[in-house]
Amino acid sequence: MTTPKDQQHVPRPAQILFVCHPLTGHITPALRVASELHRRGWPVSFLGPTTHQHRISASGVDFIPLQDEADIDDLLYYSPDNPNPPVPWYHWKLWYERALVDVEKHCLEPIPAQWRCVKQALASLQERSPDIPTVVISEAFFHGILPLYFGAALPDGVKRPKTLCLSVTPPAIRSVDLPPFGYPLPFSQSSEGRARNAQAWDIFGEETSSLKKLFHSKLAEAGATHFPSGPILDGTNYTSHDAILQIGVPSFEYPRSDWPQQFQFLGFLPLGAPPPNGYPNLPSWWDQLTSTKKRVVVVAQGTVETDPNDLIIPTIEALRERDDVQVVAIMGRKGATLPDGFAQSRNALVTDYLHYDAVLPYAHVWVHNGGYGAITHGIAHGVPMVVAGEGQDKPENVKRVRFSGIGVGLGTPRPGIENLKISLDAVLGDARFKTRVDVLRQETEDLDCFGRVEDALLKVVAR
């Protein structure tokens, strides 16, 4: 069998343009795929926000900056210290209200600016390499590619590209078996459940009609001549593409009856190779962790919900009296510390920032805020989890953690000491969680994520 290393100098039949939703949690997995394709010899460019220019360029791919309203700084956007929040009182709104604001500000309003950037990038790439086609790999929530499918014109002489959808979150594609994304209704294939789901979709369509109008308005501003008929978040941003590539495995998803024909699972992203000289900037207590005989619970606060009182401190308190457990707490931001006056327990090790792949090989339980990336890291390392969090895609992630049996889903960003104690005792004391997460880890290894992406590229180019 020819290995990717053997093929690095074999001419590729297309050049690739990655376009991606500007949030860190979307860019990180998309960039993993982009950099691996670059390593395999594909010419790869990445259209991304300027706040991520350094890390995108450092991966080896060609960075193309998003411009104007499309150039979003997500860390500033979500910061409580943002002098210009997306809407007044944003951080005091309920999670689903914030989620709809995010759809408006991140997905819909930037469409015209994103489309201008896409057109400029396609023209530039064609001029650079006129003899090979360009294939666009669009992360699912980058809506700026959609004008292409609704009648908007490309610049004169620019060839229409094939496009692949890369999904790095649970798939937000409408199904008769599921309610709208984020609704607290269960998966159901019964006639009653499907009727309930249909009713929920009708209600959701009415509740989000203003966003649908904004969607159509921004498509029209970008040059579209016709428009999607369904409500927002019905999956148009997936099904418009030639193929849908889902980072994930069937066992983490509901067995829905109506997957789109062009949908396929890739498996989760494989573990990255450790740096040749080891992970840098390890905390001073690192040797204590690697030599411990205790069971290790790793808890991370995350980069969006950054208040340690939400998850880190309650986890430390829940395990304060457990002499058989070592807690590792990751604050999630460089320079972050626990509040002054907090009495740190003797079984807790705390750091501001630590690469998940460095610490999870030592973990017995993984406590986090429910981001899809955190879940995939846990599965890749075979670590069962306790999952908190709300907002964005987190309610859907939590439901899938429960459904798949890989951990306990709490479904709140502030679960409290007692809830965490009960949940941690359950996961530490029941081997079935570890058994299930190992099943999913094996499933993802069998699928070969990067190989499937490359196969999809070759197939779409050959059509």
Task: Describe the residue ranges of each PLM region.
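Conserved nucleotide-sugar donor-interacting segment of glycosyltransferase catalytic cores
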Residues: 107-198, 250-253
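Long, low-complexity segments enriched in small/aliphatic residues
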Residues: 222-266
